[in-house]
Amino acid sequence: VLVLCSEAMDPLTLVRCYPVGYISMLDGGKNDEKIIAIPFSDPTYNTYQDLMDLPGHIFDEMAHFFTVYKALEGKEAVAGDVNDRQAAIRVIRQAMDHYAECFLGGPVRQESQPSSDR
């Protein structure tokens, strides 16, 4: 998850966020969805609800980051489609179900639908 935040954060920091979209990537020949999220408490970004609402230069920075960070490992990554908030939520749920099937013996059960709020 790439967290858009106006403050610097240490790697592996836990932050309460909401998804705004994802970028489809081809990473080492495999599909890889990069979830983009925003902290609830971030004053710069927390007015954005969907990745499509962000300024264009933010997309350029993210695409550049995702394509060059793998180059340091001698690997190739290609940025693809940009997807909205609802698509990101579907990807997250699929990943949770896959994890539950692999490690918990069954899919995650959704007792109630989350609110449309962030």
What are these regions (language model features)?
Residues V1-R118:
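Hydrophobic N-terminal alpha-helices or hydrophobic patches in metabolic proteins across all domains
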